UniProtKB/Swiss-Prot annotation:
Any one Gene Ontology molecular-function term assigned to this protein's record: orotidine-5'-phosphate decarboxylase activity
Active site, UniProt feature: K62
GO cellular component: cytosol
Gene name of the record: pyrF
Protein name: Orotidine 5'-phosphate decarboxylase
Short name of one Pfam family: OMPdecase
Tagged with keyword Protein biosynthesis: no
Amino acid sequence: MHDRPIIALDFPTQKEVAVFLEKFPKEEALFVKVGMELFYAEGPAIVRWLKEQGHDVFLDLKLHDIPNTVEKAMTNLAKLGVAITNVHAAGGVRMMQAAKEGLIKGTQPGAKVPELIAVTQLTSTSEEEMHHDQLINVPLETSVIHYAKCAEKAGLDGVVCSALEARGIQEATKQTFICLTPGIRPAGSAVGDQQRVVTPQHAREIGSTYIVVGRPITQAENPYEAYQEIKKDWSEK
């Protein structure tokens, strides 16, 4: 597991991100997530700016398209030097293989290839919704583990999943396979639009490699204090 929780920068503009980051010590190197809202508003410049501030970036765009398109997109994203990026496992093994090839092609000589992970089922998706909307008539965990095995077959580094599925995925894949888990909430906090949530401590105990935390930090009265508490809960054994 990695000791820094990933902070979801779910803000609409770089200006708001800058205001938020001012609440942290300048020397604090963070691991942050840039999702669709922020990336589509600010473009690649937001990633470059965050890296200039000394932060690691998980670029969460969930690519899902034909293999050729995804490969070319990943070649360009690799040039940004992000630490992690992702695709939708539902795009299939060929698409995921193409994504990995694109990342390798786009990574600068001597630089580390970004970790590539696949989204299995969104943590906002309930089993009932999966059955009704996606016509996937197996238990939700079975679907998630199937997608994880497809991602492993494609040569990906891991998956995005609920911590509730992490142990099953680890039993079905190689030991180094990553389980990055959103839907993390400290004890007693609101779950919002998430369906399958756990605490940082529980995520650690059941096998998460990385955790992503958004509103419990970004909307806290004291974000740095909230971050430190979550980091402690996540990293202490």
